Design a protein with these regions (language model features):
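Repetitive, compositionally biased segments used for assembly/scaffolding
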Residues: 2-175
Length: 175
């Protein structure tokens, strides 16, 4: 839905005390919505939310803000299908500190495929502490684990058992 006439689209603009909403409805019933807060921090809007395809370009708009929410999101806290931020939540979540999603990265990552530096929790996971079905790390708790100290179906390192017993949630599983 690209703007073939190269005309400026007629947005419905609503100003609230927190920011500005821009909306555009297409003839086929789809729509585009965007909210940007008036408050900013280091040049970024405090909240930026996007939904749908831009009537100007026909493409999705990347939400960029301190808190960014949209199909594509980039911010300190980013929430979207593909998100990049210090804290990222989404199907593809590239987080610096924390990632939560189907495929995520971060110092701590929780996902189906979690690539954590310090902590990873997921089906396929890495991290200094790795907990998952298939896991790789220094301290590993997994069905199939690889690493220095592993507690798995086939391996029971004493160091791994003692380490994981220090976590109250996990120690109850040991008899």
């Amino acid at each position: 839905m690209i703007n073939t006439l190269l005309e400026k689209p007629e947005y419905k603009i609503v100003k609230t005390r927190l920011g500005t909403w821009r909306s555009f409805g297409y003839v086929d019933g789809t729509s585009f919505h965007e909210f940007k807060s008036d408050a900013t921090w280091m040049g970024l809007p405090l909240i930026h939310y996007t939904y749908g395809r831009s009537p100007e370009t026909g493409r999705r708009v990347c939400a960029k803000g301190v808190i960014a929410i949209g199909r594509l999101a980039c911010g300190i806290i980013a929430i979207g299908h593909a998100s990049i931020g210090i804290v990222a939540v989404g199907q593809l979540a590239i987080g610096l500190l924390f990632g939560l999603g189907q495929l995520s990265t971060g110092i701590a990552a929780v996902a189906q495929m979690a690539l954590g530096v310090y902590f990873g929790l997921g089906q396929f996971t890495t991290g200094y502490i790795a907990i998952g079905q298939f896991a790789y790390g220094k301290y590993v708790l997994a069905q199939f684990g690889f690493g220095e100290f592993v507690l798995s179906m086939t391996q029971r390192d004493r160091e791994a058992i003692d380490f994981f017993k220090t976590f109250p949630v996990i120690k109850d599983f040991f008899h």
